[in-house]
Swiss-Prot record:
Annotated TM spans: 6-26, 62-82, 87-107
Location of this chain's protein in the cell: Mitochondrion membrane
Record organism: Marchantia polymorpha
Protein name: NADH-ubiquinone oxidoreductase chain 3
Cellular-component GO terms for this entry: mitochondrial membrane
Entries under PANTHER family matching the protein: NADH-UBIQUINONE OXIDOREDUCTASE CHAIN 3
Amino acid sequence: MEFAPIFVYLVISLLLSLILIGVSFLFASSSSLAYPEKLSAYECGFDPFDDARSRFDIRFYLVSILFIIFDLEVTFLFPWAVSLNKIGLFGFWSMMVFLFILTIGFVYEWKKGALDWE
């Protein structure tokens, strides 16, 4: 019984999502697919220079993955900083160990050349 509000929330979310998808299909015009210009790529009013589905350099993916990893790790700092006076020395030193491991990972990636753009 304690999970009833979560179940109600999920049911309402599902119903609202289905209603919105249904309304969009109901009011969508099928004539918009008839114009090939609507399906073409748009680059600031110019004709596209190249195919829009070209390959990206792997470095873009590497930098984005590194950003996501370090960004998620930094999100652990906010709750720690807010509750620093309540967690005591154990919480402080455990976060220092966490930051030390984070720093070691950053230095390792730097030394391996993951952050070089050459």
